[in-house]
A protein has these predicted regions:
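Hydrophobic membrane-embedded segments
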Residues: 1-117, 134, 150-151, 155, ...
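Short helix/loop segments within enzyme catalytic domains
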Residues: 136-142, 153-154, 203, 228-283
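Hydrophobic alpha-helical transmembrane segments and immediately flanking/interface helices
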Residues: 173-195, 279-284
Length: 284
């Protein structure tokens, strides 16, 4: 399995590197939506430790396990392994001797420790983040949410909380999605834009997308190109969400959306397993 993981990591590194190099051209010709799906396919391939091999040849040629040597007279004599005894020290190696740990086992331990440690680091950070903001959150009753849900034809209504500890709107929760709003006096138009952005993340299941990226990064924690891929995928995830939100919208809505994003941009800590409108956790 470990050999397959290293082989897949090496082969996919070439693909990732190529995509990162040609990204400027792809950005001009293809929307973020296509890059979003390309990274998804690569992440899935990185997670599945199965090598795709060509079928073996139907004809197998077996080589006889025999040793041929010559007498001085030049007459060949066939001697099998069972009857051949080399000269010199013929003492058998003790069957009880075995190395404490092989190199392959050592590599497996190092890789497993790194993979589990990397994954747990992000999961624990996510749990700490949720506990950190919980005392600073309160239920928000905003009628605009119903309007956005109706316009998007979404039946599932997420929980809406106002949190003084965050600096930008975001969505958390895998099974029970929750939209967090910072303690900012938004206009109704701004709220509509913010909620549509986060509801688009919910509709697409983008938190699961992020979890998939973290899983791939955990398995290939030793590969720096995978880190670059995850960074690019998270960026394209937000860009593709923006494209979906403003699709078929008039110029006024696009302007309002751009202004809202600019308003949300500030130096913040970003929770890995959350979506955010260009922001994150307040440093205050």
């Amino acid at each position: 399995m470990l050999k397959n993981i290293f082989a897949i990591s090496l082969s996919m590194s070439a693909v990732i590197l190529l995509l990162l190099i040609v990204s400027p051209l792809l950005n001009k010709r293809y929307s973020a939506k296509w890059r979003y799906f390309i990274w998804l396919i690569i992440a899935i391939r990185l997670i599945i430790p199965v090598r795709i091999e060509l079928p073996k040849a139907p004809v197998n040629i077996s080589v006889p396990n025999q040793i041929v040597f010559f007498r001085q007279e030049g007459v060949p004599v066939m001697v099998t392994d069972d009857s051949y005894t080399p000269k010199g020290n013929t003492s058998p190696v003790s069957a009880d001797y075995a190395p404490v740990i092989t190199l392959q086992e050592l590599l497996a331990v190092v890789w497993g420790t790194g993979a589990v440690g990397f994954f747990l680091y992000h999961i624990i950070n996510y749990i700490i983040f949720k506990r950190k903001i919980k005392p600073h959150c309160k239920k928000a009753n905003i009628g605009v949410l119903d309007d956005v849900l109706e316009d998007m034809k979404l039946k599932v209504k997420p929980q809406l909380l106002e949190c003084s500890k965050i600096a930008s709107p975001m969505m958390i929760g895998f099974l029970k999605p929750t939209i967090l709003l910072p303690d900012i006096d938004y206009s109704n138009n701004e709220l509509y834009v913010v909620l549509k952005h986060e509801l688009t993340h919910i509709r697409r299941g983008d938190l699961w997308y992020k979890l998939l990226l973290i899983t791939a990064n955990s398995i290939h924690w030793f590969n720096p190109l995978v880190y670059l891929m995850v960074k690019a995928a998270n960026r394209d995830l937000e860009y593709s969400c923006d494209d979906v939100v403003v699709k078929n919208s008039d110029m006024n809505f696009r302007k309002e959306y751009s202004l809202t994003i600019l308003k949300a941009m500030q130096k913040t800590e970003k929770a890995v397993l959350s979506t955010y409108l260009n922001g994150g956790v307040s440093n205050e």
